[in-house]
Amino acid sequence: DGGYAEPRPCVILTHGYPGTARNDDLVHALRRVGCVVLTPHHRGAWGSQGNYLVSHCVEDALAVAEYVRTPEFCEKFHTDPDCVFLGGHSMGGNTTLNACRKLPWLRGLILMTPFDSTRLIRNGRPDQLRALLPAGYNLTGYDEEVFFRDIEARVGEYDFEKSFDAVKDQNLCCVEGALDTLAPLEEMFLPLWRMLEAHP
């Protein structure tokens, strides 16, 4: 709209499972300070075509991140292709940490109570993960067993600690809830955070 002389930063915010669709309060706060904000709906969520899987969420985030760097997008929305941030809430934090490994050009990451989808399986509590899956009943083409198997197949790949090399020198903002019982800091994010603290 010509209100900013310099190209604007672009922020991509990914939603949780099935989560809050757009995190509108945060979106508007970012918009008011001059950011262009995208809140994509992953495959199978809120009317989007396709099936909702953790691996699809990562693929979707990669596709959106590459799209916002195209000349067409940058010209239309007056954004800086070198000032793109990726963030997410809960399972969207999982999406962010796994997608960022293939997006070394990101300016920064925003994690809000990130949920490590493989953690409960790795910690010997797969039934606790399965107990969460009925919440996805409203997702298109959703099958609890297929969803679980998609996560299970990514143990050792999607573990948060595997993101260390991608985030060790990255701008990172992580917001956690001290009383969060679904994605507790100690279990979900603290193992990676300790690795980052030890990084010189």
Where are these regions (language model features)?
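Hydrolase active-site cap/lid region
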Residues: 98-147
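Serine-hydrolase catalytic core
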Residues: 147-200
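Short beta-strand element of the alpha/beta-hydrolase
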Residues: 7-16
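Conserved alpha/beta-hydrolase
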Residues: 31-49
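Alpha/beta-hydrolase fold nucleophile elbow
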Residues: 76-90
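Short beta-strand-to-loop junctions in surface cap/lid or active-site-entrance loops
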Residues: 1-7
